[in-house]
Amino acid sequence: MISAPDGRIIFEHEREDLAKMVKLIMERDDTNIAGGNFSFKVTDDDGKDYIIMTPTMMSQAYMGELSPEQILVVEPHTRRIVAGEGKLTREINLHEGVYDANPNIRAVLHSHAINNMFWATSGLPEPNVTEATQKLHEIETLEYEPNCSEPLAELVSEHITDIGDRALMHMYLLNSHGVLITVGKKDKVMDGLSAIHQALAIVDTSEWNAQIAYKQAVFQKLGLLDGFYSEGSKIGTLDDLKEGKAIFNPNAGIGKSDKSKKRSVIV
């Protein structure tokens, strides 16, 4: 049963929050006017899950200015819109595929982030060099499948299944398309709103990483660097990148001084 105070809309706080998030993502160039789509899971009073999701054309038609009433409440698999004004995006198949592949995932954020899309169109893995993004480990570009297609949804679902618990804090690059971020927790039902906020942090910090990794690649060609560097360590080279090797810092959070004996916490 979905309950709400008299005169109020169901899941009002969650839908209001997601509407604000859409505007912020647009303002920070974490997506373009083609938009992308964002969702997270909520549970009603009887323990039934629903998907809180942005409507189609949220950016092109409404330029990211959405009201809470325009955020959709969707019944999984039937795709019935329980509440909300607007139509369901065709990429609901992508979101459902992720949630089905790993039920611990509570949020999916798909956007067309400008700097990450540079790496996504290259077909190369994105070197992961900044401290804030090390929790993502490898940033892989998947094989190309057309947007909104069932083959794309199936491809992503297969990869989510293959990486297991790593999918609970992960980002894929969708070839020539954008990013796909998944967030959740193992052995604990993560609050969906917290999960989508974590996904927001990931898309924003990864944008900085994408730009910095690009500049480090340029510096290598100029002879100013001999590799990709992260937290004071060389973690890969242009040759590694060309070969499609994952470039990230396996020793992230460990300082270089004698005083640093413990792994620091990455937030």
What are these regions, as identified by a protein language model?
Residues 1-267:
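Glycine-rich flexible loops
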